[in-house]
UniProtKB/Swiss-Prot annotation:
The protein's name: Non-structural protein 7b
Membrane association type: Single-pass membrane protein
Lineage of origin: Viruses, Riboviria, Orthornavirae, Pisuviricota, Pisoniviricetes
Miscellaneous section: Bat coronavirus 279/2005 is highly similar to SARS-CoV (SARS-like).
Source species of the chain: Bat coronavirus 279/2005 (BtCoV)
GO CC, one annotated term: membrane
Amino acid sequence: MNELTLIDFYLCFLAFLLFLVLIMLIIFWFSLELQDIEEPCNKV
């Protein structure tokens, strides 16, 4: 039982890390998109 709970905790931790990485990638991509949109406006 203890091994199963440890494995479940490990899987939940990995899923949480993957979720954080996905959020960071989305925020990073969104910030790049905003910069691409702002650059032409600043040039004009």
